[in-house]
Curated annotation (Swiss-Prot):
Pathway: Purine metabolism; GMP biosynthesis; GMP from XMP (L-Gln route): step 1/1
Any one Pfam family match given in the protein's UniProt record, by short name: GATase
Gene: guaA
Protein name: GMP synthase [glutamine-hydrolyzing]
Subunit and partners: Homodimer.
Length: 512
C-alpha cells in the first residue's frame, strides 16, 4: 500500500496535513522527527513531508534529520520549518527577519508543485503565512517558485533530487483550493502514490488486525460511552470477535441527561447487551476538592481504568478496548518532543502502570470523520454517527474547578435545554459540537422583582471538519435569546448565560 510519511517537527497543524493527504485516498502516517533513517526506509514510503515546527534551524539544539535521507531517492516536501531545514542542509542561510502572519499576497511561478495553478508566467493570490524565519537565498541547484513582499524565497524546488519546499502551510491556507492542489500534485504526480486508502478497505484491515492481535480464546472488555467512537468500535469488535466481546457502560455520574437509559436502548437495538456499572459515588469521592483541570482528567482516567479492572475480574477478559482516535493521541502528547502537551485525554493519559489488561485501540490512527465513515460502512444508524462528540471525562471538564453533584446537575440540565433547542431549530447537524459549561462564579440578577445571586452558564457551539481546528458557530441572536431565557427560567440556580466566541486555536474546544 502506498503511504506518505510525515516527520513531525512540532507543528500544531501536522495532523491536519495528514488528514488532507488521506482525503486524497492515500495513507499517511505521522512519525517523530528523530525516527531512525533505517526505520523510515523499512516503511518504503512513496514520499516524505517535513512538517513545520516552533524551532529555528540555526539554534544549536534544533531538530535535524540524517542527511543521508536526501540520497534515498524519495520525494521530500518541506513545510515552513521543514523547508528551512532542507535549505540549511543544502548550504543556504536561514535567519530571523520580518514576520509574516495571516493572509499575505504571494506570487507563484511555474513549478511541479503548482501545476494547474500557474499556466505560463505567474499566478498572483493570497496565502496564509505564519513564520518568523526565512530562507535568504535558495540553495545551489534549487530555484524559487513563490515569493511574497517580505519573503522572497517562499517556495523552492530541486526537481532532479525531488526536493520541494513551502514557507507556508498548504493544509491550512486553502481559501481557493490552492493548498489541496499543491498537496495533490506532490502526492499523486510527484510521489505517484496510488489511491489505496478507502474506508471499505480499512474496515477489512481493522477486523483482520483485531483477529490477529486477540488470541482465539481471549476475550475483550469494551467501555461504552454512547458516543460515535465507542459505538463504531463496539460494532467493529462484535463483527471481529462475536460473543468474545463484553461491553460495559460505566455511570460516572458525569454523563448527559438520560444518558444511561439511552445507551442501553441504543445497543440493545444493535443486538449488543451491555453491563451497566454505577460508579458515580466513587468518581465524586475521588474528585472531591480537586480544581486543577489536568489533575481532574488524570483522576477520571485512572478511576475509569480501576473500575474496569474490577469489572474485568468477574468477566475473565484479557483485553481492554478503548475508542481512542488520532486527535486524542495528538492532544495528549504530540508525536514528537518538539511540542507541548495541550491536555491529557482520559483514554491515553493517566493509565496506571499496574493495569491488569492489555490495551486494544483499533481506531487510534483514524480521524473523527474517518470513524464516522467507517460507522456508515458498518451499518450504524444515523443517530449514532451524527451524534456530537462527548469528552471521555464527561461533564467533569464542563464544570470548571471543583466538581460537585449540584454543579453537575445544573450543567446537565442546561446542556439538555441547549441541545433540545438546536434540534428544534434544525441546527444540531449544522454545528459540529455544542454544549454547556458551568462557571463557578455568581453574579447579580433580578428575578420576580427580587435580587438574585446565581451561577453562570456558558454555551459553546463550534464548526469543524477535523476538530484539530474549529470556528465558533454564529448562532442567531433570536436563537441564543431563546436558549438563555429557558435556562435562566428553568434552572433556579442560574442567573446569567454567556456565549463563547473563541476559535481553536487559540482556545481548545472544551474549556478544560
Amino acid at each position: 500500500m502506498s503511504k506518505i510519511l510525515i516527520l513531525d517537527f512540532g507543528s500544531q497543524y501536522t495532523n491536519v496535513l495528514a488528514k488532507k493527504i488521506r482525503l486524497l485516498s492515500v495513507f499517511c502516517e505521522v512519525l517523530p522527527w528523530n525516527t531512525p533513517l533505517e526505520d523510515i526506509l523499512q516503511e518504503s514510503p512513496s514520499g516524505l513531508i517535513f512538517s513545520g515546527g516552533p524551532h529555528s534551524v540555526y539554534q544549536e539544539n534544533s531538530p535535524k534529520v540524517d542527511r543521508e535521507i536526501y540520497n534515498a531517492n524519495i520525494p521530500i516536501l518541506g513545510v515552513c520549518y521543514g523547508m528551512q531545514l532542507i535549505a540549511r542542509d543544502f548550504g543556504s542561510e536561514v535567519r530571523g527577519g520580518e514576520n509574516e502572519f495571516g493572509y499575505t499576497p504571494i506570487v507563484f511561478y511555474p513549478g511541479k508543485l503548482f501545476q494547474g495553478l500557474v499556466d505560463k508566467d505567474a499566478f498572483h493570490t493570497e496565502i496564509r503565512m505564519s513564520h518568523c524565519d526565512s530562507v535568504t537565498v535558495p540553495p545551489k541547484d534549487f530555484f524559487i517558485t513563490a515569493s511574497s513582499q517580505h519573503c522572497p524565497v517562499a517556495a523552492i524546488e530541486y526537481p532532479e533530487k525531488k526536493l520541494f519546499g513551502l514557507q507556508f502551510h498548504p493544509e491550512v491556507s486553502d481559501s481557493q483550493g490552492i493548498g489541496d492542489t499543491i498537496l495533490s500534485n506532490f502526492v499523486k504526480h510527484i510521489c505517484r502514490a496510488s489511491e489505496t486508502w478507502k474506508i471499505e478497505t480499512i474496515e477489512k484491515q481493522l477486523i483482520q488486525r483485531i483477529k490477529e492481535q486477540v488470541g482465539e480464546k481471549e476475550r475483550v472488555l469494551l467501555g461504552l460511552s454512547g458516543g460515535v467512537d465507542s459505538s463504531v468500535l463496539a460494532v467493529l469488535l462484535h463483527n471481529a470477535l462475536g460473543d468474545r466481546l463484553s461491553c460495559v457502560f460505566v455511570d460516572t455520574g458525569l454523563l448527559r441527561k438520560n444518558e444511561v437509559e439511552e445507551v442501553k436502548q441504543q445497543f440493545l437495538s444493535l443486538g449488543l447487551e451491555i453491563i451497566v456499572e454505577d460508579a458515580s459515588e466513587t468518581f465524586f469521592y475521588e474528585l472531591s476538592g480537586i480544581q486543577d483541570p489536568e489533575q481532574k482528567r488524570k483522576i477520571i482516567g485512572s478511576t475509569f481504568i480501576e473500575v474496569f479492572d474490577k469489572v474485568s475480574k468477574n468477566l475473565e477478559v484479557q483485553w481492554l478496548a478503548q475508542g481512542t482516535i488520532y486527535s486524542d493521541v495528538i492532544e495528549s502528547a504530540k508525536s514528537c518532543d518538539a511540542t507541548q502537551v495541550i491536555k491529557s485525554h482520559h483514554n491515553v493519559g493517566g493509565l496506571p502502570e499496574k493495569l491488569n489488561l492489555k490495551l486494544l485501540e483499533p481506531l487510534r490512527f483514524l480521524f473523527k470523520d474517518e470513524v464516522r465513515a467507517l460507522g456508515k460502512v458498518l451499518g450504524l444508524p444515523e443517530v449514532f454517527i451524527s451524534r456530537h462528540p462527548f469528552p471521555g471525562p464527561g461533564l467533569g471538564v464542563r464544570v470548571l474547578g471543583e466538581i460537585r453533584k449540584e454543579y453537575v446537575e445544573i450543567v446537565k440540565h442546561a446542556d439538555s435545554i441547549f441541545i433540545e433547542e438546536l434540534k428544534k431549530a434544525n441546527l444540531y447537524d449544522k454545528v459540529s459540537q455544542a454544549f454547556a459549561v458551568f462557571l463557578p462564579v455568581k453574579s447579580v440578577a433580578v428575578k420576580g422583582d427580587c435580587r438574585h445571586y446565581g451561577y453562570t452558564i456558558a454555551l459553546r457551539a463550534v464548526e469543524s471538519s477535523d476538530f484539530m481546528t474549529a470556528c465558533w458557530s454564529p448562532l442567531s441572536r433570536e436563537f441564543l435569546n431563546r436558549c438563555s431565557s429557558r435556562i435562566i427560567n428553568e434552572i433556579p440556580e442560574v442567573s446569567r448565560v454567556v456565549y463563547d466566541i473563541s476559535d481553536k486555536p487559540p482556545a481548545t474546544i472544551e474549556w478544560e
